[in-house]
Amino acid sequence: MVQLTSDCFAFGGKLTRIDEALQAILESLAIKKETEQISLNRALNRFLAEDVIALENVPSDNNSAVDGYSIFFDDLNETGSTALPVIGKAAAGRPLNCIQKRGEAVRIFTGAVMPHGANSEDPDTVLMQEDIQLENEKVIIPPGIKRGSNRRLLGEDIVAGTRVLEAGMRLRPQDIGLAAATGKALLSVRKPLRVAVFSTGDEVTDPGEE
């Protein structure tokens, strides 16, 4: 650019490029990176200040993935049908109130905690209700069932102590749901930046003014 002696650019030095000026301004700013603890229902679109570590396993117990019947796989007849008496019921939030023994079946619903067995041997398989017949309070089970079918294991999705969300990320609805699933009620986020713009001059007016 040619500098004339009678124009406003005639300061006798090198002109600063706009991008260089912006970079110099940004480098001179002292931005305070403050954090705050907020509830999950206020966390959408906020920036996470620290990693989120799972406080508990997901699922928190062995549970059923379907509506059906909890059994011990080793009770099944490999070549023919098996009949087992139904001795109780387990629902989500209402686990079986007794021990499930070998040779027994328990009516179980999706999300219900798997019953406990005797001598540290727990039932390990869930039959879908569509795959069995019910006769005289007994389930008739066809051959061909796989061990461990339709059972979700403790910590199968998330193991307690693992990092599930990384600091610096912008929180989406699914991230907040994940934090809730792992036991978090509050999240540490960056406080929003506060920026002020000053306009000066006698010619400055509010929008709509003449």
What are the functions of these language-model segments?
Residues 1-83:
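Short, low-complexity N-terminal leaders and the immediately following helix N-cap/first helix
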Residues 2-13, 70-210:
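Short, glycine/charged-enriched hinge/interface segments at domain edges or termini
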